[in-house]
Amino acid sequence: MKPDIKICGLKTPEAIDRALKRGATHIGFIFFEKSPRYIEPDLAAKLAEPARGKAKIVAVVVDPTNDELDEIVSLLKPDILQLHGNESPEHVLTIKALYGLPVMKVFSVRTAADLKRVEAYIGIADRFLFDAKAPKGSELPGGNGISFDWSLLSWLDGSIDYMLSGGLNKDNVANALANTTARGIDVSSGVESAPGVKSVAMIDEFFDAVEGADAPVMASGS
């Protein structure tokens, strides 16, 4: 079973075109102004057009206001909302009800304690994404190019649908797939030549590494 592959933080038609040609199942646009991958909703909407019907369009937000979500959803018309902040289970339910869109809830992980919140979102969020917790002093909740100990996810038996993120690149993605039950992988900084600058060549290398992975995607965690 092939994993879903999400290329996140896209800002150029060239990177989107290559991601689609290589088989990306999801493309992500980041609406967090402190990120080097930030994009205005109207530009994201234009760039997303070639992807409609080919890949899921994901809007990545961090503790958004209702006005911010209204603008993003109205212009981009995303398939999925990715919540990367401190949104409570109740807030997730409210957002789902308001926009009628599936939600992918992100959890930032460094230790086992960071995963204690997950249970409260089971049956509420449509999918989870596990990312590495930002280093001290960083203003970015994700896209920091660091990984976490994947063995912390060993309690996930495959019944919970999640994507794996956090420092993934061509050199470690095969191990990530072999040692977790992730049904999808999310990459951003791992296909960049500089923060916020996607490299077409690195996108190719990442897909080559996924396609060359020897281990089955649904291998049990360790």
UniProtKB/Swiss-Prot annotation:
Q: What class of enzyme is it?
A: isomerase
Q: Which reaction does it catalyse?
A: N-(5-phospho-beta-D-ribosyl)anthranilate = 1-(2-carboxyphenylamino)-1-deoxy-D-ribulose 5-phosphate
What UniProt keywords are attached to this protein's entry?
Amino-acid biosynthesis, Aromatic amino acid biosynthesis, Isomerase, Tryptophan biosynthesis
Q: Which gene encodes it?
A: trpF
Output the superkingdom of the source species: Bacteria
Q: What PANTHER family does the entry give?
A: N-(5'-PHOSPHORIBOSYL)ANTHRANILATE ISOMERASE
Could you tell me which species this protein originates from?
Rhizobium etli (strain CIAT 652)
- Sequence similarity: Belongs to the TrpF family.
The UniProt record lists the EC number as: 5.3.1.24
State the protein's name.
N-(5'-phosphoribosyl)anthranilate isomerase
Q: Which NCBIfam families match?
A: PRK01222.1-1 (NF002295)
Name one process (GO BP) from the record: L-tryptophan biosynthetic process
Pathway per the UniProt entry: Amino-acid biosynthesis; L-tryptophan biosynthesis; L-tryptophan from chorismate: step 3/5
Q: Where are the transmembrane segments?
A: none
One Pfam match, given by its short name, reads: PRAI
Isomerase is among the record's keywords: yes
